[in-house]
From Swiss-Prot:
Its main location: nucleus. Residues 1-37, 86-121 are annotated as: Disordered. This is EKC/KEOPS complex subunit GON7. Component of the EKC/KEOPS complex composed of at least BUD32, CGI121, GON7, KAE1 and PCC1; the whole complex dimerizes. The lineage of its organism: Eukaryota, Fungi, Dikarya, Ascomycota, Saccharomycotina. Component of the EKC/KEOPS complex that is required for the formation of a threonylcarbamoyl group on adenosine at position 37 (t(6)A37) in tRNAs that read codons beginning with adenine. The complex is probably involved in the transfer of the threonylcarbamoyl moiety of threonylcarbamoyl-AMP (TC-AMP) to the N6 group of A37. GON7 likely plays a supporting role to the catalytic subunit KAE1 in the complex. The EKC/KEOPS complex also promotes both telomere uncapping and telomere elongation. The complex is required for efficient recruitment of transcriptional coactivators. It comes from Candida albicans (strain SC5314 / ATCC MYA-2876). The gene is GON7.
Length: 121
């Protein structure tokens, strides 16, 4: 019997948990669609030096690839939730709470660029 990873996302603002399952006809790879460097960096000639190695055709290697696919599904879902939340709050720049906007900008820069908080101040 082959075990397949799944994930469940819960949050106070959603009625029922969101379940993530892998489909049987889905190709799995350790090169995730949402875990690589940004398209902007790639177009500028950047190189992903942290790119993972390909998975081996072993039970653990296949699990590694399945987990990467599952992570992609979660990342896409969470990105969509963030976009909806941003629209719900007026788009992030439409005269809302400036401090919250600054915090979100700081978080984005840290996550996207690896900028340290001390460097920004």
């Amino acid at each position: 019997m082959k075990l397949t990873p799944t994930a469940i996302y819960t949050a106070p603002d959603i009625d029922s948990p969101k379940h993530f399952h892998l489909s049987k006809n889905e190709d799995h790879s350790t090169n995730g669609k949402t875990t690589q460097i940004s398209d902007i960096v790639i177009k500028a000639g950047g190189e992903d030096r942290d790119k993972p190695s390909d998975h081996k055709d072993t039970p653990l290697g296949n699990l590694r690839a399945e987990l990467t696919t599952l992570q992609d599904h979660l990342n896409i879902f969470l990105t969509e939730r963030m976009k909806l939340e941003k629209l719900k709050n007026g788009g992030g720049g439409g005269g809302g709470d400036n401090n919250k906007s600054n915090e979100q900008d700081l978080e984005r820069r840290i996550l996207d660029e690896g900028v340290e908080e001390e460097e920004i101040e």
